[in-house]
Regions:
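Active-site-proximal mixed secondary-structure blocks
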Residues: 7-49, 53-182
Length: 182
């Protein structure tokens, strides 16, 4: 890590939080969507996710994110197994959510186009999103591709039609949790 990057990381005001005290906030926010940010080989991307959960496994705090195999985010996570979860606490920008939830990061810089501001994370190499200050920094400790054929038929029909990709589950150990403050 370069000196300038170290100074930027320290300059950003962050209030450390206990992730368990915000688990309900994060779970409720998933209903409308939260951002998952990834970065690899100099490319940053954020996407809106509505599926995930937070808890403990293997004596570690974990956020599990589900990403379709067709997504650009999956490519980035497979190259750099770190991500941030960025949760709105005072509402959300519908334009940013619409863009990041429907456009492909292979084709455009969604973060820039959505007018979002990235800030260096404390531990992982993936940035956080300033406008969505409740942040979890995660390192993938386990990854598994779903086999939709093992799901009940009603779920298969609703979520996995013939032309729809399956999901990869990324179990990210929560290595830092904080609120970004101005």
């Amino acid at each position: 890590m370069r000196l300038g990057e170290t100074m930027r990381r320290k300059a950003m005001n962050r209030k450390k939080i206990d992730y368990t005290e915000y688990a309900n906030v994060i779970t409720k926010a998933l209903e409308k969507g939260i951002f998952l940010t990834s970065k690899a080989e100099g490319n940053e991307n954020c996407m809106v996710i509505g599926w995930g959960h937070i808890g403990r496994i293997w004596e570690k705090p974990v956020f599990v994110a589900y990403v379709r195999t067709s997504r650009y985010t999956r490519e980035l996570l497979d190259k750099n197994p770190e991500f941030t979860v960025n949760v709105p606490v005072n509402g959300f920008d519908k334009k940013a959510f619409a863009l990041c939830g429907t456009k492909n990061g292979r084709d455009m810089d969604k973060i820039r186009e959505a007018g979002l501001t990235t800030v260096p994370s404390e531990i992982v190499s993936v940035p956080a999103i300033k406008e969505y200050p409740l942040t979890l920094e995660c390192r993938v400790i386990y990854r598994e591709e779903q086999d939709a054929s093992k799901l009940p038929s009603d779920i298969q029909k609703k979520f996995y039609s013939i032309d729809t990709a399956e999901h990869v589950s990324y179990y990210g150990e929560i290595v830092a949790a904080y609120m970004i403050e101005d």
